[in-house]
UniProtKB/Swiss-Prot annotation:
Pfam families: Response_reg (PF00072). The modification 4-aspartylphosphate is found at residue 58. Transmembrane segments: none annotated. Residues 8-125 form the Response regulatory domain. PROSITE patterns: RESPONSE_REGULATORY. This is Probable chemotaxis protein CheY. The lineage of its organism: Bacteria, Pseudomonadati, Pseudomonadota, Alphaproteobacteria, Hyphomicrobiales. Its main location: cytoplasm. It is found in: Cytoplasm. Mg(2+) binds at residues 13-14, 58, 60. It comes from the Bacteria. Binds 1 Mg(2+) ion per subunit. GO terms for cellular component: cytoplasm. Keywords: Chemotaxis, Cytoplasm, Magnesium, Metal-binding, Phosphoprotein, Two-component regulatory system. The gene is cheY.
């Protein structure tokens, strides 16, 4: 069993199409345990019920944005060790710095390639195969 097959991934994005595209990309990389949520509140509920190893979250979402969700994950003792990647359409340096300060493992600009996503994940977990 590859590392990718063992990692539980949570995708959090308010756009259904984005969640589906990202899920397809992760499946191509060998991930099998993929869950998704439509916003940070729903994502946090999933994380507290069943922690995941990797969270990939959009930045701009209703109810709880990616930064708020990151803060919630990092302050919960049961979820704080999860790797966290934020996706953003905004090329905002302040966002990248804030995300890093709060413990994000990476911030990827949209649109991104599957190779960039793979590199961001491998930076945390090592080679996926």
């Amino acid at each position: 069993m590859s590392i990718a097959e063992k990692i539980k991934v949570l995708i959090v994005d308010d756009q259904v199409t984005s969640r589906l595209l990202l899920s397809d990309a992760l499946t191509q990389l060998g991930f099998k345990q993929i869950t998704s949520a439509g916003d940070g509140e729903q994502g946090m509920k999933i994380m507290t019920e069943q922690p995941h190893h990797l969270v990939i979250s959009d930045f701009n979402m209703p109810k709880m944005d990616g930064i708020g969700f990151l803060q919630a994950v990092r302050t919960n003792p049961n979820t704080k060790k999860a790797a966290f990647i934020i996706l953003t359409a905004q090329g905002d340096r302040a966002l990248v710095q804030r995300a890093a300060q709060l413990g994000a493992n990476n911030v990827l600009a949209k649109p991104f390639t599957i190779e960039k996503m793979k590199a961001a994940i491998e930076a945390v977990f090592g080679a996926l195969k």
